[in-house]
């Protein structure tokens, strides 16, 4: 058994992480930290976690654990690392964006960095959009087939914005609504480009990324296309070969939709040749494969557990 601690456990990703850890057979939760919820029972804040009614949020717990997860929001993890000394031998998995381009952290996309994650002490968990998009493109990059501009439209649920209230997270604004934000300038683009260059060093194509807010709570659907002369048969071979030993990325001929993946750590991908273009659809749960589930997947690899330990989850389906 390993002892785990969660910093920033009062929000959406922190709460989802506690849900996974509470049922993980190889884990004991050592502490749950939250400045805003300090002194409250975890079950009083995350009211489905009845079994954690005796675990209380602490504002400043001693960092005594085998691994610490940082779920603090973007820009806050680096401050935490500056102000706190993580003891030697304590591993760290950051779910924010602070260290995704930092060479002192291993980028935690198992489908890209599987073996490096196994020996890592510090992991930077990928972004949710970045995960969905990379899993659609990695087989092409590995075979140096990304040679034209890439067009991406992707929509995310409201939990992707976090728990803090804002104008665009109010129910009355989000419900029955859809909107574009950060067109061509989303913060996940640099980490996507870096990963593609890791496999295809000469990659220098434009990523035309249009992110969208949806009126649902969970899930990401990414629709991606670019010109390519690769045949459908070769596309099928590329994807089946790349993902044959990856337990959470599923390649399908069916039309992917969110109900296939919500409440799971799976990413479902379809690839089709459409005239002169290749079209890829990628779907995942932004709180699981896009955040907390992938963090647990990384933890499993770091400690030598089966990759799917504690992550055999069922989709909502309907």
Question: Which role fits each region the language model picked out?
Answer:
Residues 185-251:
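C-terminal substrate-binding/catalytic lobe of Rossmann-fold NAD(P)-dependent dehydrogenases
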